[in-house]
Every structure is written in structure tokens, then in C-alpha cells.
Amino acid sequence: MLELVFVIVVIGILAAAIIPRFDRDTLYEASEQLLSHIKYTQHLAMVDNVYDDTNQNWFQNRWGISMSEDDYNYSIAGSGQVAVDPTTGDAINGTGDYNLNDKYNVKIDVAGATGTYNLVFDHLGRPYNGVGTTAVNSLLQNDLVITLTAKNGENVSITVQPETGYTSLGDFVSP
């Protein structure tokens, strides 16, 4: 019995010494979160039944994710409503968990854009791009590259492909 207590104490000491050494990879967490929310936005666009025979512009009701390079946050909205995070039930509105700089100390950079960038998906899942409201008529023609950079200079890119909207995570690059 004494041996069992001794073994438990030793395991407890080792666990207390080892567990604090596991560092969080905040860049990985932020990139996975943004990647999954881009895919979620595309999913919402494809399953949302926005057809309205009384509105000739029904096809312009789209879901989009707006990314701010100034505040390093993002929000998802479409069809007159803000998306709800299925894991937490919170609105994905650019605050709290959706501010990557506050939560993960990570910055967003969208290639070729300044300020707020809108990535919009139509009912077929095709991506449109633009700043402000120009996303309605500008089908994505080239790969869209979103770079996330951690405080230590490490970065990773998320790529959205034209026509299909296929979204992928690139390799992590150290400074």
C-alpha cells in the first residue's frame, strides 16, 4: 500500500513538472479557426434558401466573411443576419473569439487588400471578392491568399481557390 502511495506521489510530481512545458501554438489555433469559419461561411451560402420569385435580385443575397486588417478581426453575415457559431452559440461579429489579435496575438493580411476585405459566397459556393460592396459582382479569378502572422514572425497562409471556393492551409513558415 505504501508503494502505491509513493508511485502516485511520484507521478503527480512528474505531471506537475511536465504539463506547464506544453506551449499553445496560437498561430495554429487561429489559422484552424479562421479556416473553419471560411468553410462555414461557404456552407451557409449553399444551404440558405434565398430564392424569392418576387425579387429579381434574389441571387445577390449571399453569405460573406469580412476580415479587417486594421483590427485583425472577422465577422460572418448574410441574408440580413449575423452567423451563429455552432460550437458556442455566439454571434460571429468580430468581437471576443473572433478578434484574432486579442485572442491569439495574430494579425491578418489579405493579399492585395487594405482595410476591410469581404469574401462572399453565392448559392453555388463560388467565391467573390472585394472591398466594401464590390463583392457582389466580382467572381474570384485568382487564388486568394490570407496570411496570418504571429508576434514572433511565424506565419501561415490560407488559400481560397476560385470557382470552387476550396480552402486550404499552407505550410507554417518561421522567420
Please name every model-derived segment:
Residues 1-22:
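N-terminal single-pass transmembrane signal-anchor helix
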Residues 22, 26-31, 167-175:
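Polybasic/polar functional segments that serve as interface/processing modules
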Residues 26-57:
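Membrane-proximal N-terminal amphipathic helix
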Residues 44, 48-51, 59, 114-136:
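Charged, amphipathic alpha-helical segments
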Residues 56-124:
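Type IV pilin-like appendage domain
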Residues 126-128, 152-175:
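Low-complexity, S/T/G/P-rich flexible repeat/linker segments used as non-globular hinges
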Residues 138-150:
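Short conserved beta-strand and strand-loop elements enriched in small hydrophobics
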